[in-house]
Amino acid sequence: MDRGLSTGTHNDNEGLRERPVASQSASTLSPEALTATGDVEPKDTGKELKTYGRTPDGTVFTVPQTHDMVSQLLSPSEPKNLSDIIVLAILGAHILLIWALPKGAKVPVSAVLYLFWRAGYNAGIGWLLHNQSHHKTLVRWAEKTKIFVNPATGQNPHPHLYNLIKRELETKIPHDYSFEKAPLEYNTWLVFRRLVDLILMCDFTSYCLFAIACSHHPVNESLLMTVLRWFSGIVLVLFNLWVKLDAHRVVKDYAWYWGDFFYLIDQELTFDGVFEMAPHPMYSVGYAGYYGISLMAASYKVLFISIIAHAAQFAFLVFVENPHIDKTYNPPPPRKRTIDQDTASTTTHTTDSPIAPAPVDENVPHAPTFSSRPPPSVHNLLGFHNLDLYRITDTSSMLVQFLVFAVTVLTPSTPWYQFLFVANAAVWRLWYSVGIGYLLNRQSNCKAWTRHFVKYGETPHEAWNQWKGTYHLSMIMCYASFIAAVWKMYTLPSDWGYGLVLLRHVLGAGLICLQIWTSVSIYESLGEFGWFYGDFFYDESPKLTYNGIYRFLNNPERVLGLAGVWGAVLITSSGAITFLALLSHILSLAFIQFIERPHMQKLYGQSIRRDAGLVKNLKRSLPPPLKQLHGSMDKIVDGSFEFIEDFLENARPKLAAGVDTFVKDTTALFQKYPARVTITRIDEDVAGYDSRDYSLEVEGTDSSALAECDQSSGREGANARMPLDRRGDLKNLVFEYGAPIKVKWTAPLNHSKKDWIGLYRVTDNTSREITKVSSQGRWIAVNEGSYDNLTCEKGIVSSDVVIPAPHGDNREMASGEVIFSSDKLFWTQGVFEFRYHHNGKHNVMAISRPFEIRIRRFEEEGHHEMMQTSVENSLLPVVRNCFDRDPEVAPETVDEQFGSLVERDGKYAKRVVFAVHQMFGIEFAPEVVRADGTVRNLAWRICNAKKVLAPYNRS
């Protein structure tokens, strides 16, 4: 079946640097740029169309043609410059070093060299790109050093470096490029390219040197094995070379060197060839050559270091590439806004809501609500983070896994027990494919599963939930019993170096990892709805789209989804496990052919794609005779399946009577990456400043009336109940939860431009002179351009505004304002303070008045309808604060939908559930906030939860 079913939008951004360029407004582009973007039809002018780039500030420029690093370095036709000579000299030094070393030192030295350059690639370049993506660090370095400013202006302190860079770059790009006219971002990217060239060339060269140092001919290896080993290795290397060349043909130097971290091109990018064959081809199949070289070297050392390098490359993809791709090309869609506010305002506010049960439910508690739409996915089943031992499905799954584990470990591995475990695994595989397949077939044809629950007064949603539990438990038992059988059949090798023992284990582990990755990719593409075959239960199915892994394969579970069972075959070398693997594969293919495909054809018809990206490319590459052979084989296979279908159709009445009665009935991931590592340092020149010249004044959304009401609660002594006797005009500062806080600062005119203000709990720091606790990103610089990131400048309102000094002093002071909001706030209750720090260090020059963040406790009203209205009114400003008052996320009214960013970033929902817990004493999961989608729905849920829990809250 083409399970390219997705509840999300179509997303094709699955290849390495495979980035569709964000379209720009046609009115802001030149005619040439409009031609490049396709907004204007190109005219036949006899000239080659040029590519136009766009910097973040909107500057449009011509992107000159450049060449790949191998051609630049080694091709005699390409001009050479000093940086090329330096790179070639470093490469030559590597070769000479390995050649000159004694035999015993070649392997460790070459390994250290390679690991150094690999770390320079994945950690070094990764760190630079991460900071460039988030803070424009490289461009800011160029701005601060002024290395691209013409020395004729007198502003460049490095004229010789300017001339050197100018000569180097213009030598490499003789056409359509002017160093003086090119944007700062483009010149910075060109310099960054030279660093990348050095690291990548040294990385590959040191790897090859390590492989040469480790290469040997295995003892007693037959001639046939040697030929096969070298032939396979050469094929993998040639395939790797084709992947690299084809990828460069598609993405050019712009994406090859991560150009979109610096600027965008006003041109639609097309991705074909290797980008239709595999996800992230440069990082997945693009490393096949490493394993080919490992084969030719016949060295496990080379194999293991190749695996380490490949894993590091995937880490680079996950932590650097993918976040930038999502930020640049996958912004959240515009939020759904209320079309007619007047209509919304006149709607009667009853206990009903879009998610509330109909009024009839108040009188008939178990009345079913029939809906063709799937319920919102709030409490998912899959994943350790969704484990909930209060749920019977999860408890049952954990118990049966524990029982399987206990029986497996506590019983001996005798032939009789091995037979029992293999038979048990075979039975569960038969149930998982044949039994579940039968149930789904009945559900597809006559809604048998849903009808059973409706017959007993349940809802289709209840039938769906019970089905998910049944399928989940069946899947758990299928794989748990298979793993138990593998455990019983496995024997730990006595000699890991004998024959292919170690290789079999490495390949087996790799296949198991491949199946895990495939399953995760399938789940990410289909979601909970598609994973549990939701379109068998709900007629209103989402549009059939092909994204994620389904962009490349129609049925990834057909081959890749069972790679792990064949990995177990390699590891165990057992005939019984081979039988289980064959049984699993045959049954899975039959399940796809007889259950999934007919249902998909009935549901989606002609919209089902015949060939996925990989198959299309393979067919395109086949010669005509092989294409004809492929067509003949397709006819044979289709005819065979038709025969089997006819046979089963005729036998169905005889089997139905017996089969129809068969079935009737923690992780949490937290991430806390401090944006600032705090090390206590005392600045030597702090003595030249008077701390009395520094001050901080705090302003926020006032909530002090709540504090004043709480001061006299009747729990204090008689004197404490009296009004406060204030000897000044100051009053307690109590601000709303999540509301932005403005900080006004004053400092001497000669204050350091690297001064900064941090937010802390009052109890965090015992010292008033030095801050010894990390700000964890809750800090703002007082001046722009002083630090190499943009995050610390978010919130600056004004800087260095000259004002007269207070207290009548005949001098002037500098002042400014910053606003702390969003991630720069503490999302909890407590007492906090701001600290003004000197010169980028942690010497405290001023501390603000302490202020309290408090969430007002909701006061209940008697009437339910009035209570819900009050809850809505109290909840709306809190939700808006939790959503940073962002117009693309925060609702303006109680009926307005939350922005789509709430679905993508879990912090917003977590803020809301904390506030709800403090206000109403009701604890929700973050998924509830995302599922409700509006303040009104959430208020309805709160009111009903309080009504349900009221009997248990009585004191």
Curated annotation (Swiss-Prot):
Entry's localization field: Endoplasmic reticulum membrane
Residue numbers spanned by region Disordered: 1-61, 328-358
Leading EC class: transferase
Biased composition (Polar residues): 1-10
Gene3D superfamilies per UniProt: 2.60.40.2840
Topological type in the membrane: Multi-pass membrane protein
Molecular function GO labels: phosphatidylethanolamine N-methyltransferase activity
GO CC term (a single one): endoplasmic reticulum membrane
Biased composition (Low complexity): 341-352
Compositional bias of kind Basic and acidic residues: 11-20, 40-51
Known EC number: 2.1.1.17
Keyword Cell inner membrane annotated: no
Highest rank taxon of the organism: Eukaryota
InterPro entries xrefs: Phopholipid_MeTrfase, Phosphatid-EA_MeTrfase_fun
Pfam assignment, any one: PEMT
BP term (GO), one: phosphatidylcholine biosynthetic process
Involved pathway(s): Phospholipid metabolism; phosphatidylcholine biosynthesis
Catalyzed reactions per annotation: a 1,2-diacyl-sn-glycero-3-phosphoethanolamine + S-adenosyl-L-methionine = a 1,2-diacyl-sn-glycero-3-phospho-N-methylethanolamine + S-adenosyl-L-homocysteine + H(+)
Keyword Transferase: yes
Transmembrane segments: 82-102, 109-129, 195-215, 223-243, 277-297, 300-320, 389-410, 419-441, 473-493, 496-516, 575-595
Lumenal side: 1-81, 130-194, 244-276, 321-388, 442-472, 517-574
Family, as annotated: Belongs to the class VI-like SAM-binding methyltransferase superfamily. CHO2 family.
Described purpose of this protein according to its UniProt entry: Catalyzes the first step of the methylation pathway of phosphatidylcholine biosynthesis, the SAM-dependent methylation of phosphatidylethanolamine (PE) to phosphatidylmonomethylethanolamine (PMME).
HAMAP family cross-referenced by the UniProt entry: PEMT
Protein name: Phosphatidylethanolamine N-methyltransferase
Species: Aspergillus terreus (strain NIH 2624 / FGSC A1156)
